[in-house]
Amino acid sequence: MSKKKIATEAAVIESYTVFYSGDAEKISPHSKGLLTYELGKEDETGSLALRLTANGEGGLFSREWITLDAIHAILERQQDSFPSRVFRSLFGQGSTNNAGFLAAVLRSPDICLIEADSSRLFMHHCYADWQHRMTQLAALSQD
């Protein structure tokens, strides 16, 4: 009986309305296919989140929703160049690909919060105006 209750609570927690869907190129030049992601608004609280929904080449990844507030908190702590692994703590489960895939989405032209470090492909740094860009993403949910 408690299993049903847990399943019901999980369904409520995962209740998001998707307001944007997009594609992102993977970071590695050797990887093929695109990553597909969604931006959503949690129905009860109104919090905004992002999740991966497809990997064009197949392979493991997590479909869990990651709040924009949690992403903001991670980015706020980055002073210099940083690796994708800083995003690992955002995922409760799944593949080691998750952090790198999230970084790829955050680099994508439609999200555009971080960019490649000029000297190291797999390192990132935040755009100077990333917080303003985050506000613009939130505004998409109002349209």
What residues fall within each predicted segment?
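Short amphipathic alpha-helical interaction segments
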Residues: G92-S108
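Short, amphipathic alpha-helical interaction segments positioned at domain boundaries
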Residues: H125-D143
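Long, low-complexity, charged/polar intrinsically disordered regions in eukaryotic proteins
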Residues: S2-R63
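Short acidic, hydrophobic short linear motifs in intrinsically disordered regions
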Residues: I66-I71, E76-F91
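Minor-groove-contacting beta-hairpin "wing" of winged helix-turn-helix DNA-binding domains
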Residues: S119-H125
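A structural signal for long, well-ordered, hydrophobic/aromatic- and basic-residue-enriched core segments
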Residues: G56-A73, S108
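Generic alpha-helical scaffold signal
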Residues: F61-W65, R77, S81, T96-G100
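A short, conserved structural fragment
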Residues: R107-S119
